[in-house]
Swiss-Prot record:
Key words of the record: Calcium, Metal-binding, Muscle protein, Repeat
Single GO molecular function: calcium ion binding
Residue ranges occupied by any EF-hand domain in the UniProt entry: 5-41, 57-92, 102-137, 138-173
Domain of life from the UniProt record: Eukaryota
Chain residues that bind Ca(2+) 2: D70, N72, D74, E81
Name the record gives this protein: Sarcoplasmic calcium-binding proteins II, V, VI, and VII
Residues binding Ca(2+) 1, per UniProt: D19, N21, D23, S25, D30
Organism of origin: Branchiostoma lanceolatum
UniProt xrefs under InterPro entries: EF-hand-dom_pair (IPR011992), EF_Hand_1_Ca_BS (IPR018247), EF_hand_dom (IPR002048)
Length: 185
């Protein structure tokens, strides 16, 4: 099973990335709220085509998540169902490619939420805005960004984000994946 630290990180993903209305469950309206929040953060920089593509992706994501986690088939994914899904998933997950499809599809969407300039790289200012816009409790943003970039040796691009997201979800101990929660390891 998962240790308490892993459960805490999984709870963060549930609360922060999915349960947008904070009612303790994931439902269709949470995905609608995600689109609204995403548009607010990106200040209208989404084209209509991007918006439609993202909306279709979120609809697919919700179907896949429900199919994997909604044990009682009530069109609601509770925290307990979400945790049970992750306990099964993490037991066999060895890389990003082993993550559920809905989770893999979410990664570029989340990355775009940080990379508001659209240049494929999240710089310090964009990361600071991400922490502020999403109300992450980050005491020292530059220090956290330094961990993300390994002291400037690694570019904070989509591949780095994938690696950090995978580590956030699967690592049994504090490591660089915590930076996506605005925390140093």
């Amino acid at each position: 099973g998962l240790n308490d630290f892993q459960k805490q990180k999984i709870k963060f993903t549930f609360d922060f990335f999915l349960d947008m209305n904070h009612d303790g469950s994931i439902q269709d309206n949470d995905f609608e709220d995600m689109m609204t929040r995403y548009k607010e953060v990106n200040k209208g920089s989404l084209s209509d085509a991007d918006y439609k593509s993202m909306q279709a992706s979120l609809e697919d994501e919700w179907r896949d998540l429900k199919g994997r986690a909604d044990i009682n088939k009530d069109d609601v994914v509770s925290w307990e169902e979400y945790l049970a899904m992750w306990e099964k998933t993490i037991a066999t997950c060895k890389s990003v490619a082993d993550l559920p499809a809905w989770c893999q599809n979410r990664i570029p969407f989340l990355f775009k939420g940080m990379d508001v300039s659209g240049d494929g790289i999240v710089d310090l200012e964009e990361f600071q805005n991400y922490c502020k816009n999403f109300q992450l409790q980050c005491a020292d943003v530059p220090a956290v960004y330094n961990v993300i970039t390994d002291g400037g040796k690694v570019t904070f691009d989509l591949n780095r984000y994938k690696e950090l997201y995978y580590r956030l979800l699967t690592s049994p101990a504090a490591d660089a994946g915590n930076t996506l929660m605005g925390q140093k390891p």
